[in-house]
Amino acid sequence: MTASLWQQCLNRLQDELPSAEFSMWIRPLQAELSDNTLTLYAPNRFVLDWVRDKYLIRVNGIINELCGVDGPTLRFDIGNRPHPVAIARAPARGAAPVNNLQKSWESKADAKPEPNHKSNTNVNYTFENFVEGKSNQLARAAARQVADNPGGAYNPLFLYGGTGLGKTHLLHAVGNAIKERKKDAKVIYMHSERFVQDMVKALQNNAIEEFKRYYRSVDALLIDDIQFFANKERSQEEFFHTFNALLEGNQQIILTSDRYPKEINGVEDRLKSRFGWGLTVAIEPPELETRVAILMRKADENQIHLPDEVAFFIAKRLRSNVRELEGALNRVIANANFTGRAINIDFVREALRDLLALQEKLVTIDNIQKTVAEYYKIKLADLLSKRRSRSVARPRQLAMALAKELTNHSLPEIGDAFGGREHTTVLHACRKIEQLKEESHDIKEDYSNLIRTLSS
């Protein structure tokens, strides 16, 4: 009964949730039915709290649909069912029970660390000073779990997204958290080009065996911008074997890229396939509230009072990435220090006038319409027409939502630009896209791709 009921729940959840979300939160759960109580076991407190907070109502609803009023009561606990049941239809390749991997990793604590391994993570990047929002919530949660259970939670963890969105911050945060938990952990952070350089140097010095031993004896290997392996066949060959060795040893691998693994050109298919063995999570451009929070956090760190209206003014006009936001605020702070003037909207307009002018020039409604039409391979005239077929209506709604997000035009102005539509039509389109971004991985991916294109 347990296997049958929970398997049906799993099948429903796998159909309804994005694959990354399902793999991260639902797949690790184990189920046990006793005395008309269905107990779901989570591997740790973090997962338990998240699942109970985010999925309790959804799972209860599925159970009620399947069993009616006589369905079992749902409860949560931490631990492992003695005989795990009910796996998802397509379990992650290479996955193993979390508790076994955790014990394996922790058993290395008594091993004498090799003296030539020196952690090079930046201690200034932590989970505590990473500003969380809807755009990066899943990535941060995955990174946090990996830090708590290296080699066991998600291996490899693959984070992808545009420049300046926080991927590197999370890499360092994981490394620092692992080191804090296990002082002698061998954690190596590097850019992919450094791996290539080290390998070339090892080949030149006839020291390839030392190179292999070094990289295959770490507890956690954190590699940034893996797309730079493209067209470097010898480096890919060596990393392929290093990857396999680390995975077999339950040693953690975290990779980042500016694009989804399968979209990385010039990288062998066997590597791209392995990149997806664990968990792949996107980091999206930050939404308005997160951009404001980032600015306020940065101002606090610099002991600068940033009025709310100023933070919103900057955040509404600079949308592409965190690095751009922080750079703009640094310029505002520097100008305020040099001139002794108060930070207000007029002052910010002056301090950032070239940056704001460039942003407004880059992102126009006309530019958005052309970009969306090209992205979906439809005619611009159709996008602006009265046609209601889904192949045209959905891109039109996306374009309207992007215009509201990326420009300072009012809803009536946006409606006029889309063939004289009412502002209520634009508002409906924006709300519909927000809903679809929660429900459809494809829509969420398209929206993020378009924002990256328009903001680059």
Swiss-Prot record:
GO terms for cellular component: cytoplasm; plasma membrane. SMART domains: AAA (SM00382), Bac_DnaA_C (SM00760). The keyword Nucleotide-binding applies. Residues 1-83 are annotated as: Domain I, interacts with DnaA modulators. Residues 120-336 are annotated as: Domain III, AAA+ region. Residues 337-456 are annotated as: Domain IV, binds dsDNA. It is found in: Cytoplasm. Domain I is involved in oligomerization and binding regulators, domain II is flexibile and of varying length in different bacteria, domain III forms the AAA+ region, while domain IV binds dsDNA. This is Chromosomal replication initiator protein DnaA.
